[in-house]
């Protein structure tokens, strides 16, 4: 049997060489022929051309999936995307390392009844992404380094729900502002929250979260969505702020925080940062480096992947414009936004390539590239173009908007920009921009939203002030800021009718890091209790203190509490300087954190 398959593969190799285009019967195949860095959980996605009888793909023997040692894989067959996409899922995951052969036999037929020419292709299983924490720490260290120069070092830590202060207002557009605070700054620390505010800075909704969260937004279907960093996925809430769904990447990929777009057909778009150990990136660069690629996925209403774009297949690592490729960690794309274009294709923003890329959503091929090393456009009225941008969006007039962080402008400055694109003659004409006076510079994050009345909401990202709203003539009508050193990833403005007397309740049990830390001699310890069941309206809370050896010092708290956020003071006046631990037990939940007493 093995000899038979070897003969079949040999004959197929000859067939492929002789065939002018063995893939001409298919608009899209994923994994791509010859692709590498494929996950063990990968599915095979096939989009046949319209003249293929898609039902013949499900016949026994029409498609075979073979491993490198000629072991045939059994698989399930599913049709998605209105009958246009076939998804094959092997009964058992692939095993790395291996070469996988996908063989299309002459049992696959066209709508006229004729058979296709048999062919096969292969791709390479190289295991799943390496530990994402390596890159998480690396990425955050870059942001923090940029942020330190912007933070007022005298700013105190902000606990609980941060205040949003209006610094200027002159008839802003109606609506509510949706945002979140970034919390993992070295100084000051602050409590992660999901926030909705009115034009006067009053919070109409706030929810303290146990860990960092991002991208609070309203989707076209009316759901409120946000990314929960502790869970590594997006969650959706209804208008009562109740979690009703979750969204995450498929095919073994982790879910990135930068973007979730829910489409009108129930599909959704996400991205994943794919961390790989690369033996050789070419040229004189070091061997054996850790590289972050990007995966763009479209998933259907059943959360099956129906489309996938992988940077490994289309971008070069050397496409990065300002990354130091001599380092051991390389983030060459750093994609941060996805937009469904008016023609149904995709636009993605890749910050570290200084590039907006248009991708054919049917074939997965690149249509054009704007900015960066592979720029195909001529910039008009904007000779320097954009630098390390965020927030690609196609607006109603057909133009695109961006938040230009401007990291490599000289000197650096940030702005909101609008281009009119001629996609035939490849020109990008700057038709509008807003640049604050004096300049505001945000080294990372940020967003631009064109509002219904043609005003523009600008979230300044990793700096203060937090956001502003401007008219098309450049007149500022609103400016708001979080406390100094507290930033927001994005901000949006939408019509929204808040619930009357809505309670601000935590979503989960949590023990929050004490503040200040280090401390002398008093510090505050906070904890949260989510909504409780009807059977139990209170929860017993026990907090104990231990020294660095684990010896019990004292019981700080033993009492019953209802749902909410609480704090308790710990006084270390009678203790020596050193490391201590505080531990909480609330029902089945327990946690321990470290604190440092310095005298």
Question: Where in this protein do the model-derived segments appear?
Answer:
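Blade-terminus and WD-like Trp-Asp/Gly-His loop motifs, strongest in beta-propeller folds
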Residues: 79-82, 217-219, 263, 516
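Surface-exposed loop/edge segments in extracytoplasmic proteins
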Residues: 69-76, 203-204, 476-477, 551-557, ...
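Histidine-/acidic-rich catalytic cores in large beta-rich domains
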Residues: 127-503
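Sec-dependent N-terminal signal peptides
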Residues: 3-14
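Exposed beta-strand and adjacent loop surfaces of beta-rich binding modules
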Residues: 43, 60-62, 191, 538-542
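Positively charged n-region of N-terminal signal peptides that target proteins for export
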Residues: 1-4, 599
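Acidic, low-complexity Ser/Thr/Gly/Pro-rich repeat segments typical of extracellular/periplasmic
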Residues: 20-132
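C-terminal outer-membrane/trafficking sorting elements
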Residues: 15-18, 198-199, 508-515, 519-599
